[in-house]
Amino acid sequence: MTKRTLEGTNRKRKRTSGFRARMRSATGRRVIKARRSKGRARLAV
């Protein structure tokens, strides 16, 4: 059996695409704004 090739790490995930990471940059804030206006249940990871 082949081993799993994608084993994500939560720290990396939060640091790159978490809410606070999004709020750090102008484009990230735009992402949050777009997701808010769309009515997403989850704004960030």
From Swiss-Prot:
A Pfam short name: Ribosomal_L34
Gene Ontology CC annotations of this record: ribonucleoprotein complex; ribosome
Gene Ontology biological process terms, A to Z: translation
Gene Ontology MF annotations: structural constituent of ribosome
Domain of life, per lineage: Bacteria
Region (Disordered): 1-27
Annotated Basic residues bias: 11-23
Compositionally skewed regions (Basic and acidic residues) per UniProt: 1-10
Keyword terms, alphabetized: Ribonucleoprotein, Ribosomal protein
NCBIfam families found in the cross-reference section: rpmH_bact
Family the UniProt entry places it in: Belongs to the bacterial ribosomal protein bL34 family.
HAMAP family from the UniProt entry: Ribosomal_bL34
The name this protein goes by in its record: Large ribosomal subunit protein bL34
Source organism: Synechococcus elongatus (strain ATCC 33912 / PCC 7942 / FACHB-805) (Anacystis nidulans R2)
